[in-house]
Amino acid sequence: MVQLGQKDLLVDCQGNWGNILTGDGAAAPRYIEARLSKFALDVVFNPKTTEWKLSYDGRNKEPITLPVKFPLLLAQGVEGIAVGLSSKILPHNFNELCDASISYLRNEEFKLYPDFQTGGSIDVSKYNDGERGGAVKIRSKINKVDNKTLAITEIPYGRTTTSVIDSILKAVDKGKIKIRKVDDNTAANVEILVHLAPGIDCLIGRGARCQ
């Protein structure tokens, strides 16, 4: 339920539902509230697109099936393991899915690639149109604040600011990089400030990206 709410698509949330950027967990169930969004009521639970039956106590009606008018699986993303085979469907951009759906219905060619709430840049040269064996490479976005400070403003999908900072500190412990400290100012947007050690100059260009 929390994962659905964090997507801001099917569920309207109230309370502390956690933060996918920092990895902070949601509050206990008794402290959070949810309701179906207008999008969910129209696209998933629309009475004109499915058959309904009485609920177990006869007071309400519930859908027999849920045929969705929108490629929801591609928007949400999902992963799992069955019969020893791991499968992952990456999330996609809402607007791009709508455009791709229209092109598909018109029998027109289109390109559709994954998109992520956490931002970052993606290399789709080996994506293989999302079929078996395909792979993508996702990178953070790093900006130069000044000669002594770097700002990480986007992080790879599946990572959190906490895990990114941990990887930076491990690199420091191994002597791979030299920094003075790391500040996590993330709220609605990612902002990790990396302060370089004395004697270390920042040579990265503004808007550059690293893995």
Regions found by a protein language model. Name each.
Residues M1-G133, L193:
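Catalytic phosphate-handling regions of large nucleic-acid enzymes and associated NTPases
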Residues V78-I81, L85-Q211:
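C-terminal interaction appendages of subunits in large macromolecular complexes
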